[in-house]
């Protein structure tokens, strides 16, 4: 018995010294490093304790240092945090050849549902990006605009029923915008009318709830996918299944089979992905691209149903969160500054008056103050508070002797850079004018809400258009007041900035001014 205890103590002691030496990796290399990392979670200890989301845990490290680059530990994995905006842009764009992969979990062979455009590596990513780019041309987005507007009108109709004829009512505008975004994505990607306003328990909303379940397992698994992909790969190879991905696969399979059986064609992203499966490409011609096309057997390598699902899944999960949050945060911030709210509401009224009471794709894109407001929102509340890459070849940090070894995870605290007074004076103040040509009160190098370089978000224009449309619909039909002037508290799980208690405002009915 004593021998077993002694053996256990010896093994634990050896393990401790091994980990301690492991956590001296950056110090041994003479690299500036974060000195408060705890074993075994590194700077993510607060994520494991469910006190902070991953993005805000990284932000805490950002604000405690003044170094351009900093050695950190993500779980037990040495990584590099970049705090300098110029260097961040170099990593994402000019020096892309050294950082062309995100380094997150992907297993094309054994887990094709993981092979989405966000996760894919090397040539696989380049090929998928090339195939998907035609999905997001101006012509394609314009053809989907009427679908988005119909859903915006359903949102307005729902709120009109909920609000009293006179006076204000408290509303969680984030919940409203999430329903709007889910319906937009379900319709413009899958061609399905789920109507989350009237049917809140639909299968798409359930997918979001499942993906967001706030528990320790999800926190740990999310960290592994991003930070320790080898462990995530091992789990999937021994039989672990992603219930959200499998549910999405079933939806895609049923929808594709129904369309092909009945010859149904819709102007949505899934139709383009079906075309990609059948022909190996998406037609640049916007009229042809939505037709049913087949290719002769053996001429073109097509993609699988699982690959279609992987792309639809990432667009759905990422799109519904960023679209809904951007619209909700914009309305919340405007409500705190009545003069800004009135200015944008006037722009909405003027645009409607010039276009016979309608918002068109072209008129939306001409609304200058709306664009400034959305830019300031995604500056203060970036859709992803961190940007991640993997060093794909040894890289010497410019103007230093520090070398980032191949295979090292690289993290950019976008939330940190966007909230740094060095780049954005008075960063906690919501100031759309900082982006105007007259003021230009910010460092353009530091503004990277969708990333930068070849891996910049492929669907950024689609997201911005749908967010702007939602804002227009609300300001056209409702008056908005803030409940209280306070900063939003965020959930302590996941990566995105998800409000812990919703985003609450007061709405009342409004008669649009069309002249």
From Swiss-Prot:
PANTHER family: CYTOCHROME P450, CYTOCHROME P450 310A1-RELATED
Class of enzymatic activity (EC top level): oxidoreductase
Localization: Endoplasmic reticulum membrane; Microsome membrane
Requisite cofactors: heme
EC number in record: 1.14.-.-
GO cellular component: endoplasmic reticulum membrane
Gene Ontology molecular function terms on file: heme binding; iron ion binding; monooxygenase activity; oxidoreductase activity, acting on paired donors, with incorporation or reduction of molecular oxygen
Family of the protein in this entry: Belongs to the cytochrome P450 family.
Role noted for this protein: May be involved in the metabolism of insect hormones and in the breakdown of synthetic insecticides.
Protein name as catalogued: Probable cytochrome P450 6d4
Positions of heme binding: 457
Main subcellular location: endoplasmic reticulum
Keywords assigned by UniProt, alphabetized: Endoplasmic reticulum, Heme, Iron, Membrane, Metal-binding, Microsome, Monooxygenase, Oxidoreductase
Membrane topology value: Peripheral membrane protein
